[in-house]
């Protein structure tokens, strides 16, 4: 029997991912709640959105057999035949809440079709509560997080938590049982749709066998193959890619867990995968590291001064003293002084530049650089007196081997090299320009005083199972100057001295954790499922700017101490770090659909076809705003004459302006360790290699998982292509990978797991183009358009030019 007084409070919180029936406009949705056809309540209308947020409450009279129906309509079409129907849910009250016992339940339901069978899409989140004593205006703010059902939406849960901002504890104060975990980085829910970030469960992981979730939303915990293992949830990102969330371990995967899933087996598999990634990460190097030798325990004695740098034979260039000198007689140049070490070895002080050297400035020593000419024979490339090169950079010293060969010691980093850091390039003319530039830039970059390790030690102690929080506390409490001291990493409960191995492990583990989309600070790009971009809605965590500053410090710290991070970003992110202007091409990795639409707009006549203004709609935590791209933009129509400006402004807003606050916080931390004027010597592709290193690429695996269009694997062009790739060194291969796929990163399981913008996408070589043209790349599809070149030499020449001269991450 129905109660005479209201006994249930229904809160219609939000809908997510509604179906868009019009190409160029969004609906104006509102919801209608009815019980038994007698009680009807209507929410307000939310303008222009697919993700409306109402958070409106209604008190109803119900019994356990009552059916609560909530329909969503588009107000703009409400007077039409279909009333702008967008979906409906029907809930039997007795199935979800015990009216006698009382309770509070959060429901997330898939929207269903009506009898008209119109296409619908999305979910609806509501709250049912028997507690009517609290004021309606505060009801939604008091929702019990422990009953909140994880949503496929990445834009709904934050709207609830954001309404009650509370101070977020620092990472070092993490508590798994915190009453408001959604504000902690390890519990932050993802915040935007569209987004491929992970939406963690608010509160405890899902109970075994779906005891709680099974009543409210079975579809998230099962698929066509049956029910998922306990604690697992199936979701889709905005690109329609299915991924799985393991709430037991707070991890995500693109692979469905098997029905005979075992947590221990899964943990073992994750450890094996992590070990593969660790080995790949630790094998990454840079060109300077490959040709010079590291000597961590360099001794300042004369005997070692006669020891040549190990690995010098790897260099393509030999630098030797000619033996031609002038007599070291007469007075020293003005400002110079001769001194003697305690061992009796003379050295010279230049008070003009405040530097010291073993070389007598009165002696005119010549440096001769050797390389190979086109015939493969050695020839002199350059010969010039040392005195004309100026002083060595701070912390550098020139020495001679016992065979009179010159080498250089960098006391800042305790490394040695055959290459004179003052020379523009010590590589032979046959080496590609980009490689000469990159190595030259590295030598210059690392020789600067701002990159010199300061005296003392910087101790960082962390727990492996709490590395994000501990690292935040340790790194943010220290000054930038302290972080420039020798880095000493200590893992709690483990004995060991850090001679490089521990710090490499530290950056490997930390980069896996802090860039995890689970925390909502970063999200996967539209290009694939392993490159990252800033989450524009990271503000669900009120402390997010502090975390971005921390992450900036970590990236700077890794570069400063010559360590690599196991994370890779979209090309536009590296451009932004270099303060370069982004282009429409960069949009491809951020929003492929928008990139395609903007490209169509540029290439076609839009007069009378589409109506656009210099404004965009943006949704943040349920609030939809119109943003002018230029003053008064919402009143300025887009025409064929100004559409180029429109595309440029939309691109800048989508890539830069939406995350400007987060990015500035990131750069403030980064520039505390790496000055902006120094990092700007690199281009965006070089910066990716500087941060992530250069991997050893398995050409056999690459070739094995390659498809061909218009070619056969046995064709001469294809045979020559792979022959050329095999002869290239690791850096050239990484450059080719950047050119064709947009990133130098290789999936953990090799090229078989290569991803494109629309899911798994194998590397493809297509027969396309005139033999006189350069190869082209399509990074969204991992495709190389390779013309049918007649000879191996022409192929190598054209391919090298395409790879080294391309400014962006691919030409199309």
Curated annotation (Swiss-Prot):
GO cellular component term of the entry, any: nucleus
CDD domains: C2_Smurf-like (cd08382), HECTc (cd00078), WW (cd00201)
Domain WW: 226-259, 330-363, 390-423
Active site: 780
Region named Disordered: 131-235, 250-350
Biased composition annotated in UniProt, kind: Low complexity: 307-330
Pathway the protein contributes to: Protein modification; protein ubiquitination
Gene Ontology MF terms: phosphatidylinositol binding; ubiquitin binding; ubiquitin-ubiquitin ligase activity
Principal place of residence: cytoplasm
InterPro entries: C2_dom (IPR000008), C2_domain_sf (IPR035892), E3_ub_ligase_SMURF1 (IPR024928), E3_ubiq-protein_ligase (IPR050409), HECT_dom (IPR000569), Hect_E3_ubiquitin_ligase (IPR035983), WW_dom (IPR001202), WW_dom_sf (IPR036020)
Biased composition (Basic and acidic residues): 276-291
Compositionally biased tracts (Polar residues): 148-165, 174-199, 214-223, 250-267, 292-306
Entry EC no(s): 2.3.2.26
Gene Ontology biological process terms from the UniProt entry: cellular response to heat; cellular response to L-arginine; chromatin organization; free ubiquitin chain polymerization; mitochondria-associated ubiquitin-dependent protein catabolic process; mitochondrion organization; nonfunctional rRNA decay; poly(A)+ mRNA export from nucleus
Transferase among keywords: yes
Localization of this protein: Cytoplasm
Reactions catalysed: S-ubiquitinyl-[E2 ubiquitin-conjugating enzyme]-L-cysteine + [acceptor protein]-L-lysine = [E2 ubiquitin-conjugating enzyme]-L-cysteine + N(6)-ubiquitinyl-[acceptor protein]-L-lysine
Domain HECT: 479-812
UniProt KW keywords: Cytoplasm, Repeat, Transferase, Ubl conjugation pathway
Domain C2: 1-109
Function: E3 ubiquitin-protein ligase which accepts ubiquitin from an E2 ubiquitin-conjugating enzyme in the form of a thioester and then directly transfers the ubiquitin to targeted substrates. Probably involved in the regulatory network controlling carbon source utilization.
Similarity comment: family membership: Belongs to the RSP5/NEDD4 family.
Subunit (UniProt): Interacts with creD.
Name of the protein this chain belongs to: Probable E3 ubiquitin-protein ligase hulA
Gene this protein is translated from: hulA
């Amino acid at each position: 029997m129905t109660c005479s007084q209201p006994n249930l409070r229904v809160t219609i919180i939000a809908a997510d991912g509604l179906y868009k029936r019009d190409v160029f406009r969004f609906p104006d949705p509102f919801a209608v709640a009815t019980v038994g056809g007698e009680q009807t309540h209507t929410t307000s209308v939310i303008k222009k959105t697919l993700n409306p947020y109402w958070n409106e409450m209604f008190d109803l009279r119900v019994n356990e057999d009552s059916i609560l129906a909530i329909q969503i309509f588009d107000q703009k079409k409400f007077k039409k035949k279909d009333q702008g129907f967008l979906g409906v849910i029907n809930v039997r009250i007795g199935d979800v809440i015990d009216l006698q016992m009382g309770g509070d339940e959060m429901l997330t339901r898939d929207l269903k079709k009506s009898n008209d069978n119109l296409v619908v899409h999305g979910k609806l989140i509501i709250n049912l509560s028997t507690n009517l004593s609290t004021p309606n205006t505060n009801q939604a703010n008091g929702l019990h997080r422990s009953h909140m059902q994880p949503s496929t939406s990445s834009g709904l849960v934050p709207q609830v938590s954001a309404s009650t901002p509370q101070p977020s504890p620092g990472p070092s104060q993490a508590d798994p049982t915190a009453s408001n975990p959604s504000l902690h980085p390890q519990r932050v829910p993802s915040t935007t749709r569209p987004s491929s970030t992970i939406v963690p469960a608010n509160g405890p992981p899902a109970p075994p066998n779906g005891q709680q979730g099974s009543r409210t939303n079975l579809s998230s915990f099962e698929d066509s193959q049956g029910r998922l293992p306990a604690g697992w949830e199936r979701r889709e990102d905005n690109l329609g890619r299915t991924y799985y969330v393991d709430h037991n371990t707070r991890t995500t995967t693109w692979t469905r867990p098997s029905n005979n899933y075992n947590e221990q087996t899964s943990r073992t598999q994750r450890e094996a995968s992590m070990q593969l990634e660790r080995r790949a990460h630790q094998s990454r190097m840079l060109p300077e590291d490959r040709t010079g030798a590291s000597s961590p325990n360099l001794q300042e004695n004369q005997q070692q001064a006669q020891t040549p740098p190990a690995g010098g034979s790897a260099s393509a260039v030999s630098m030797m003293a000619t033996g031609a000198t002038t007599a070291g007689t007469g007075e020293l140049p003005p400002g110079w002084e001769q001194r003697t070490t305690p061992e009796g070895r003379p050295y010279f002080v230049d008070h003009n530049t405040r530097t010291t050297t073993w070389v007598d400035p009165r002696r005119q020593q010549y440096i001769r650089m050797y390389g190979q000419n086109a015939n493969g024979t050695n020839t002199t490339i350059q010969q010039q007196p040392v005195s004309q090169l100026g002083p060595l950079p701070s912390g550098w010293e020139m020495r001679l081997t016992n065979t009179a060969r010159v080498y250089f010691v960098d006391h800042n980093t305790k490394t040695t090299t055959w290459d004179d850091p003052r020379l523009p390039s010590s590589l032979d003319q046959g080496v590609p320009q980009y490689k000469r530039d990159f190595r030259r830039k590295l030598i210059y970059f690392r020789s600067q005083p701002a990159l010199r390790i300061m005296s003392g030690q910087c101790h960082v102690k962390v727990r492996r199972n709490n590395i994000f929080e501990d690292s935040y506390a340790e790194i943010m409490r220290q000054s930038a100057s302290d972080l420039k001291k020798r880095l000493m990493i200590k893992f709690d409960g483990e004995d060991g001295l850090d001679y490089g191995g521990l710090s490499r492990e530290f950056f490997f583990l930390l980069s896996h954790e802090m860039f995890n989309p689970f925390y909502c600070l970063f999200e996967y790009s539209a290009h694939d499922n392993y490159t990252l971009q800033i989450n524009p809605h990271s503000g669900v965590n009120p402390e997010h700017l502090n975390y971005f500053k921390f992450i900036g410090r970590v990236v700077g710290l890794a570069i400063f101490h010559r360590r690599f991070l196991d994370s890779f970003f979209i090309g536009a992110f590296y451009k932004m770090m270099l303060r370069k202007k982004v282009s429409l091409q960069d949009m491809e990795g951020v929003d492929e659909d928008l990139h395609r639409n903007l490209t169509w707009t540029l290439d076609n006549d839009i007069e009378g076809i589409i109506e656009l203004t210099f404004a965009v709609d943006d949704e943040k935590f349920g609030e939809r705003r119109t943003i002018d791209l230029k003053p008064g933009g919402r009143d300025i129509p887009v025409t064929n004459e100004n559409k180029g400006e429109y595309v440029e402004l939309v691109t800048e807003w989508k890539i830069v302006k939406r995350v400007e606050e987060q990015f500035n916080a990131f750069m403030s931390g980064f520039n505390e360790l790496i000055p902006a004027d120094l990092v700007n010597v690199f281009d965006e592709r070089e910066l990716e290699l500087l941060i992530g290193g250069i991997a050893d690429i398995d050409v056999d695996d690459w070739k094995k998982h390659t498809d061909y269009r218009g070619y056969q694997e046995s064709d001469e062009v294809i045979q020559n292509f792979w022959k050329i790739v095999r002869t290239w060194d690791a850096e050239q291969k990484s450059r080719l990978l950047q050119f064709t796929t947009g990133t130098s990163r290789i999936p953990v399981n090799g090229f078989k797991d290569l991803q494109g913008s629309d899911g798994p996408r194998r590397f493809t070589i297509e027969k396309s183009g005139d033999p006189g043209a350069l190869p082209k790349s399509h990074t969204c599809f991992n495709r190389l358009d390779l013309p049918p070149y007649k000879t191996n030499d022409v192929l190598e020449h054209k391919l090298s030019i395409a790879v080294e001269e391309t400014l962006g991450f691919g030409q199309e």
